[in-house]
């Protein structure tokens, strides 16, 4: 299982993103591999795109509409029963001294538990992902 972080999708959709070309290359390199996004990351993507549109005075409906269209080609993992793991996630944010946000801790927990591959541009997430895997990417 390959899981994409929020920043990969954002960079893919936003041609002005510093990582746009890298994101396109990553997706092209994956070819026909099935990739997944957690529903929590999807909600984060919607929020960031809406904010960027407002800041840049772009048409939010058009940009968000493109994201909704992209959903048809993304495998979304719908996490439920978050109440059961909330304390663990909150502790992860606290233990990282705020270096990781709640969604980051959730994403790391998922890739650890499911032995999934994480693709991200976030250096801190990469470091933490390697740490929890015992040095393996």
Language-model segment annotations:
Residues 1, 78, 84, 108-137:
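Acidic, PIN/NYN-like endoribonuclease modules and their adjacent C-terminal/linker elements
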């Amino acid at each position: 299982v390959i899981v994409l972080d929020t920043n990969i999708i954002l960079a893919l959709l936003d041609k002005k993103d510093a990582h746009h070309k890298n994101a396109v290359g990553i997706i092209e390199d994956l070819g026909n591999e099935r990739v997944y996004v957690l529903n929590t990351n999807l909600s984060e993507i919607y929020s960031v795109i809406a904010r960027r549109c407002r800041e840049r005075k772009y048409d939010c409906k058009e940009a968000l509409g493109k994201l909704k269209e992209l959903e048809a080609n993304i495998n979304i993992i719908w996490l439920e029963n978050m109440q059961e793991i909330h304390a663990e996630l909150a502790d992860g944010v606290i233990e990282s001294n705020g270096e990781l946000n709640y969604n980051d801790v959730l994403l790391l927990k998922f890739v650890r538990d499911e032995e999934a591959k994480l693709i991200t541009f976030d250096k801190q997430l990469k470091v933490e992902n390697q740490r929890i895997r015992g040095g393996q990417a």
